[in-house]
């Protein structure tokens, strides 16, 4: 028997990721040089460390139960992990298992000479099948006699071969534009998607999408790399609380000072905004008393709460509010989906080909071509036209030069975007390169200037510039025709998570440094800087008119900014966990739907989606059918419907006018991204199990 420190470090690294400690995993991966090991993370099963620890405990129990003569002296059961590593702590009396509802027994495994407590310790109950909001993982967990939860019944649809529980970034880190979309985040909400056994991404970066918060995110397969993308200090400053990317099991304690899920929306004046923003900072974790751990049947999210936890009583499907989203916690508990609105399998086309999580997908604006980006270091273009029934795919392999030859980069493709006429596709990868592809799959140009993973990438409306954001704390405007860097902006003090164009030459960027900068091509300083968030900012979006900027953060707030004011116009507080992404409706003045009111949608790790009337600063509808973190929302072209995708594997289609759920489909993996085609007839979705699927809504 032999093992190396590299092997131990890798198992610890993977354990931290799977447990939702994305920030710790990121820093540990850098300091232990995980990226330099020769371990193939794709071959290591999930919960490997817990499995080997459990086997070690069982061996120790057997060893202690057998006397020196080889005869069974006394059975040892329920040995704790700490006692097992203390040879001098051998039980003096037989251990009596404490059963629920029975008087506590003396724990004879307590250290010798220590004070014995005749009161049995509170039992941690594992309740399989209980859905827990906020879980991003896909594993089912069963309790063991050692009190350790280990994944069981791991299907490919729930946990991929790389051990990804599917951030970021959230978390937050899975690229906002894609999985990274907020992507690498702890999962940080947009969480930065942190690859398990894959690339090391700064928590809170775009791969947050794989990313999420304390509920951490999906990992991508491949050798952990990019460890030198940021220094350890940078990593610390860039970590997010939602792990964006980030969707694995999480253990939470009641948080003090947090706004309940049915909280209120405060419309702040310039002065009140600052104080309001500060007041939304995440409160300190408070210890809980008797603890119940519930394990969701569809995820390995573990939520620990005290007796004053939110009620789980049944409630209606929608909680409408005209007073800023105020409501009761019970109103946010999801109900079963009505079978009448379920989309049948015959109306869904499942596209197989990717070999790892698919973080991002986007429709071509002119044709029924669906692009997808994955942790298998490829992007793919799927022909979804009615004439093509075979779902032909073009594979866009992301390669790098090594030793004079082109080899696969083995890095996640976390962001992608079509240009305005659909003739070119831009992709961003964890290998630090952006690439431009033609619709026939040919590589047009490679854009190399970032020093680390790219978390977000966008074309401007004219199609002459591409904007990118990376872990190197910079944003870059690229000349699309030449592939050259036109201007690099280095104003953030931590990884940049998302970008969005305001005009063809001006844009906004957000970062884990809690700042939002508005910059313009040719100007060497930000033309505006917005401050007010108290945690990393996962996503930003300009309204269709380019007048208002919306931002969402791990501080659980949604803020609306105007270039005419230094402080936020609205500080919307209603979500009870990190907000991963936001989208404006394609309605209002200057759009194709000028007679429909402008609304804003927000998706959160609290498993809800909220629709906001931005003019009034109030929550119109709270959509509560999801049971896991929601990573993506998308409006139909006419603004009448909203699609949402969650790690509960469901894509829901909602009416934006009534807030009612009108269609629903359950896939085989946690959903990272949803998108509508230009005609509003099809919805595409990408999932953690490597699948991509298209829902045809024309029949309904």
UniProtKB/Swiss-Prot annotation:
WD repeats lie at residues 353-392, 408-447, 449-488, 491-531, 532-571, 574-622, 625-664, 666-700. One of its GO terms (biological process) is positive regulation of Notch signaling pathway. Keywords: Cell cycle, Nucleus, Repeat, Sensory transduction, Ubl conjugation pathway, Vision, WD repeat. Widely expressed both in embryos and larvae. InterPro entries: Ebi-like (IPR045183), G-protein_beta_WD-40_rep (IPR020472), LisH (IPR006594), Quinoprotein_ADH-like_sf (IPR011047), WD40/YVTN_repeat-like_dom_sf (IPR015943), WD40_repeat_CS (IPR019775), WD40_rpt (IPR001680). Residues 93-287, 299-331 are annotated as: Disordered. GO terms for molecular function: chromatin binding; DNA-binding transcription factor binding; transcription corepressor activity. Residues 161-198, 212-250, 272-287 have a biased composition (Low complexity). It is found in: Nucleus. Residues 4-36 form the LisH domain. The F-box-like domain is related to the F-box domain, and apparently displays the same function as component of ubiquitin E3 ligase complexes. F-box-like component of E3 ubiquitin ligase complexes; involved in R7 photoreceptor cell differentiation, cone cell development and neuronal cell cycle control. E3 ubiquitin ligase complexes mediate ubiquitination and subsequent proteasomal degradation of target proteins. Required for specification of R7 photoreceptor cell fate in the eye by participating in the ubiquitination and subsequent proteasomal degradation of Tramtrack (ttk), a general inhibitor of photoreceptor differentiation. 'Ebi' means 'shrimp' in Japanese. Component of some E3 complex at least composed of sina, ebi and phyl, required for the degradation of ttk. Probably forms a E3 complex with sno, required for the degradation of some component of the Su(H) repressor complex. Interacts with sno and Su(H) and Smr. This is F-box-like/WD repeat-containing protein ebi. It comes from Drosophila melanogaster. The gene is ebi.
């Amino acid at each position: 028997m032999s093992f190396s420190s590299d092997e131990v470090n890798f198992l610890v690294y993977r354990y931290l990721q799977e447990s939702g400690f994305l920030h710790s995993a990121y820093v540990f991966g850098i300091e232990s040089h995980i990226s330099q090991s020769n371990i193939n993370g794709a071959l290591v099963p999930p919960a490997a460390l817990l499995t080997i620890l459990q086997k070690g405990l069982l061996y120790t129990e057997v060893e202690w139960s057998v006397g020196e003569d080889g005869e069974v002296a006394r059975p040892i059961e329920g040995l704790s992990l700490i006692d097992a590593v203390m040879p001098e702590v051998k039980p003096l009396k037989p251990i009596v298992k404490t059963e629920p509802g029975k008087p506590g027994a003396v724990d004879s495994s307590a250290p010798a000479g220590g004070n014995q407590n005749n009161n049995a310790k509170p039992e941690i109950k594992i309740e399989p099948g209980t859905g827990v909001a906020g879980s991003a993982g896909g594993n089912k967990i069963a309790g063991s006699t050692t009190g350790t939860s280990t994944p069981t019944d791991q299907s490919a649809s729930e946990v991929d071969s790389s051990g990804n529980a599917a951030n970021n970034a959230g978390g937050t880190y899975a690229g906002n534009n894609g999985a990274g979309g907020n992507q690498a985040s702890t999962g940080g909400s947009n969480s930065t998607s942190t690859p398990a056994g894959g690339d090391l991404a700064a928590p809170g970066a775009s791969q947050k999408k794989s990313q999420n918060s304390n509920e951490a995110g999906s990992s991508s397969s491949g050798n952990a790399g990019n460890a030198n993308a940021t220094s350890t200090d940078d990593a610390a400053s860039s970590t997010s609380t939602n792990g964006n990317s980030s969707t694995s099991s999480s253990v939470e304690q009641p948080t003090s000072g947090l706004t309940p899920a049915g909280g209120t929306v405060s419309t702040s004046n310039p002065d009140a905004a600052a104080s309001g923003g500060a007041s939304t900072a995440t409160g300190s974790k408070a210890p809980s008393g008797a603890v119940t751990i519930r394990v969701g049947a569809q995820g390995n999210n573990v939520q620990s709460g005290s007796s004053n936890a939110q009620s789980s009583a049944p409630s209606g499907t929608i909680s409408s509010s005209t007073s800023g989203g105020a409501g009761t916690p019970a109103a946010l508990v999801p109900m079963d989906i009505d079978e009448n609105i379920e989309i049948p399998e015959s109306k869904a086309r499942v596209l197989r080909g990717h070999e790892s999580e698919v973080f991002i997908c986007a429709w071509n604006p002119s044709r029924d071509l669906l692009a997808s980006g994955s942790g298998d270091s490829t992007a793919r273009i799927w022909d979804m036209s009615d004439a093509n029934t075979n779902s032909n795919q073009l594979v866009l392999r992301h390669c790098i030069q090594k030793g004079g030859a082109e080899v696969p980069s083995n890095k996640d493709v976390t962001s992608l975007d079509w240009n305005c006429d659909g003739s070119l596709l831009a992709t961003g990868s964890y290998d630090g390169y952006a690439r431009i592809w033609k619709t026939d799959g040919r590589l047009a140009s490679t854009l190399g200037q970032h020093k680390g993973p790219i978390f977000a990438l966008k074309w401007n409306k004219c199609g002459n510039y591409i904007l990118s954001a990376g872990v190197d704390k910079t944003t870059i405007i690229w000349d699309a025709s030449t592939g050259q860097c036109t201007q690099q902006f280095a104003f953030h003090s931590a990884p940049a998570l998302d970008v969005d164009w305001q005009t063809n030459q001006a844009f906004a960027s957000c970062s884990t440094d809690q700042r939002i900068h508005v910059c313009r091509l040719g100007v060497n300083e930000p033309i505006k800087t917005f401050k007010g968030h108290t945690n990393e900012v996962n996503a930003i979006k300009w309204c269709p008119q380019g007048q208002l900027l919306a931002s969402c953060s791990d501080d659980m707030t949604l803020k609306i900014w105007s270039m005419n004011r230094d402080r936020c116009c609205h500080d919307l507080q209603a979500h009870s966990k990190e907000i991963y992404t936001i989208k404006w409706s394609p309605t209002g003045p200057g759009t194709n739907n000028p007679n429909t009111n402008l609304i804003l949608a927000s998706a959160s790790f609290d498993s809800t989606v909220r629709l906001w009337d931005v003019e009034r600063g109030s929550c119109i509808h709270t959509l509560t059918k999801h049971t896991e973190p929601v990573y993506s929302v998308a409006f139909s072209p006419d603004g009448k419907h909203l699609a949402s995708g969650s790690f509960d594997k469901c894509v829901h289609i909602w009416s934006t006018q009534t807030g009612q759920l009108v269609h629903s489909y359950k896939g085989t993996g946690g959903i990272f991204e949803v998108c509508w085609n230009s005609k509003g007839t099809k919805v595409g979705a990408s999932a953690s199990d490597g699948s991509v699927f298209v829902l045809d809504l024309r029949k309904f």
